[in-house]
Amino acid sequence: MVGFGANRRAGRLPSLVLVVLLVVIVVLAFNYWSISSRHVLLQEEVAELQGQVQRTEVARGRLEKRNSDLLLLVDTHKKQIDQKEADYGRLSSRLQAREGLGKRCEDDKVKLQNNISYQMADIHHLKEQLAELRQEFLRQEDQLQDYRKNNTYLVKRLEYESFQCGQQMKELRAQHEENIKKLADQFLEEQKQETQKIQSNDGKELDINNQVVPKNIPKVAENVADKNEEPSSNHIPHGKEQIKRGGDAGMPGIEENDLAKVDDLPPALRKPPISVSQHESHQAISHLPTGQPLSPNMPPDSHINHNGNPGTSKQNPSSPLQRLIPGSNLDSEPRIQTDILKQATKDRVSDFHKLKQSRFFDENESPVDPQHGSKLADYNGDDGNVGEYEADKQAELAYNEEEDGDGGEEDVQDDEERELQMDPADYGKQHFNDVL
């Protein structure tokens, strides 16, 4: 191998040149470093100078602004000074006016001091009057308390008296209702007695006239024809005259209003009296002696029920009038039924008149004196009215069931008659409550 020097070319620089170059590079690097450090210092100084310039500019702006503010303050102070001077002028004028008012007030004060003596005298007089008024007020308070005590006593007394009056009114109402019940019961008893009398008389007359019925047939037909020609309104005044003959029963003026108040009858009294006519037609037969036959032409298979009323078989459903009057003309039967219907209507109206007479007072009249109760109790009513017994009604019901063949069904007419029997007392109570 060859060393470093063996292969070196001829004509090249030695390593000294390299060293010189390295030295030059080091010197240049040192110079660059020094120059760069100096440049940095200069830049810092320039930055500081710029900051100072900015601060000085800010301070200058502040000073200028403060200067402008001070100028404005000077202007405002000048204006305030001018305003204060004007206010001072006004206050001086007011002060002069107040001084004038003070002088006038002093004059008024002197006058008021002069008037104080008079006012003190007036105050003393008013105090005396106040004491008198207080005494009067206390006295009136005592009187007011006394009046209140008397008022409470009077109120309690009034309540007690009103309670007693209410109790007395209740007792009087109870007595009045009892009197109405008694009068209704008396009316029913009298009606039953009259019915018994009339039934006994009718039984006797039928026994006597049973033998001479064929002779009286023409007269009966003539009487029926005459009654059919008469208007139905002729029967109502007749019943009214009968009531007037019996007396007013301590209630004058009721009879004049009877016909105008027929519409006030309960529904049971306003029903057509068909059942009453049938009952009267059967009643004439029920009181015949059970031992005698009704007529010679009575069929042998006819029987008499347990009430004494003759019954009919289903094979002979003839009317009781045909049995009573044998051989009579069939054309006269409607007239006889019409006559019986009119007579029943007349009896019903007379019963209504008696019911109205049994009341203590009328709707359009003042209450009747209780002393007239004896007159009402002594009133016997119309002797011509005919009552109805429950046994007769049951007999009529049995007779109607046998004629109709309904096998024991209830009869509407019998219910109506029962309702009619209970109507007088109930109607009197209801009418009395309506008047109260």
From Swiss-Prot:
Stretch list, region Disordered: 225-436
Composition skew (Polar residues), residue ranges: 305-321
GO CC entries: Golgi apparatus; membrane
Lumenal side: 36-436
Residues that bear Phosphoserine: 233, 275, 328, 332, 366
Keywords of this entry: Acetylation, Coiled coil, Membrane, Phosphoprotein, Signal-anchor, Transmembrane, Transmembrane helix
Coiled coil (residue ranges): 35-198
Segments crossing the lipid bilayer: 15-35
Record's subcellular location: Membrane
Residues bearing the modification N-acetylmethionine: 1
Ranges facing Cytoplasmic side: 1-14
Family affiliation: Belongs to the GOLM family.
Protein name (record): Protein GOLM2
